[in-house]
Amino acid sequence: MNRAADDLIASHLARSHAAMARAAQDTALLASAGRIAAKIVTALRSGRKLLIVGNGGSAADAQHIAAEIVGRYKQERPAFAAIALTTDTSALTAIGNDYGFDHVFARQVEGLGTSGDVLLAISTSGRSPSILNALRKARERGLTTIGFTGANGLAMGELCDELLVAPSDDTPLIQQIHLATAHGICETIEAALMQDLS
């Protein structure tokens, strides 16, 4: 690897470290994350489920978070219900073909979501039509709505019961903050649910 590549990677790591440090000191983000964990715990304790949506890298995050809830984060425990609505290629392509991509998640929320469930919608920009439509449909169906976005995505909050805002406008850094915070939320959820079993 040449020096220029080393410098680019080092620069990214330095910016990533600084962004994580800002997030760790962001009292609004931390408070929001705690409330989000509590809302998800309430739903899972009641036998409800967590639905998760996102596009691109946020779709990967949706799958990652669902895996932590259904599988386990760190502790051996019963499985809990979480579904990433980003994984069913037949549903995604059928809905996209018949209704348009803007409705690929809303249609699934309509079919799978019930009152008392939670929708976690991840959008770094806060402006993705497919994500906003999913939130609207979730509201119609009585789901608790949670959003993850970046510094420029505050308008998304109008559709969310709780909005977590990563303190950055750089998409890769927003994604890193989202996933790191999601891990903290998963650990909090797991600790609360494990306490129920003790």
From Swiss-Prot:
GO annotation, biological process: carbohydrate metabolic process; D-glycero-D-manno-heptose 7-phosphate biosynthetic process
Organism of provenance: Bradyrhizobium sp. (strain BTAi1 / ATCC BAA-1182)
UniProt domain SIS: residue ranges: 40-198
Full protein name: Phosphoheptose isomerase
The keyword Isomerase is assigned to this record: yes
Family listed: Belongs to the SIS family. GmhA subfamily.
Required co-factors: Zn(2+)
Reactions performed catalytically: 2 D-sedoheptulose 7-phosphate = D-glycero-alpha-D-manno-heptose 7-phosphate + D-glycero-beta-D-manno-heptose 7-phosphate
Binding site for Zn(2+): H64, E68, Q175, H183
Additional remark text: The reaction produces a racemic mixture of D-glycero-alpha-D-manno-heptose 7-phosphate and D-glycero-beta-D-manno-heptose 7-phosphate.
Cofactor binding: number and manner: Binds 1 zinc ion per subunit.
GO cellular component: cytoplasm
